[in-house]
Every structure is written in structure tokens, then in C-alpha cells.
Amino acid sequence: MNVVDASVLVEYLAGGEHEAAATHAIGRERWAWAPALVDAEVGNALRRLVRAEKITARKAGAALDDLLLMRLQRVPHRHLVERAWQLRDSVSFYDGLYVALAETVDAPLVTLDKKLASASGLRTEVELIAPA
């Protein structure tokens, strides 16, 4: 099982250019790890897509419904904060929470974020499924 960041979930749920790669990362069982903040991040990204007229509000609503039905293991981020802060010079605090979770559960972090995938000081495998 992988840790997936919001970029992968948005691509999977909204049917972006790299949907097939995102689907493969999540797997047939639609099971993955993510920090609990993932719902807010995905919701905000879908909002941006609607405002940019890249997807319809109806499609975004359906994507949010699908997100809530996924077998996503949402992990409270309270115990991830310290490690995320230690990574502040390499990645954003949000990304640090995903990295800290991947390190904690000893699973690869899957992302579409090239900058995150090339960050230094991470103690986990980061798999870039497509450059963003």
C-alpha cells in the first residue's frame, strides 16, 4: 500500500492527463494512506479546477463523493507534525506531513510533484508518476 498525496488523488478523481498512472498508484482496491488533511487539500484543488473552468462543479462534486467512498486510511497528523517541521527547508509543511507519514508506515510516497520527488533529506522512497 502506498502513501498518496493530493496531486495523485485529484488526478485520479477528476480524470486528468495522468489518470491511468494515478489509478495504478492507488490500486484496484482503492486503498492507500494519507494524512487526514488530504480531504481539505483535494477539495481545494477541485475548487481551483472548477474556478479555472477545467472541470464542472458537478464533476467536482462527484469527485468529492468518490473521495469519501475510497478506502483511504486517513491518519491524524498530530504525530507527524514534528517530522514535517524538520523537513521545512526541503518541502512545504503540507508535503512534510505526507513524507512523515510515508516514513512512519514505511511505504512509498507517490506524487505528481517533481519538486517533492527531488527533495533532499527524505527517509522514504518517493515515486514520481508523472512530472507536474
Q: Which residue ranges define each predicted feature?
A:
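Acidic, PIN/NYN-like endoribonuclease modules and their adjacent C-terminal/linker elements
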Residues: 1, 99-132
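Active-site neighborhoods of divalent-metal-dependent phosphate/nucleic-acid chemistry enzymes
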Residues: 70-115
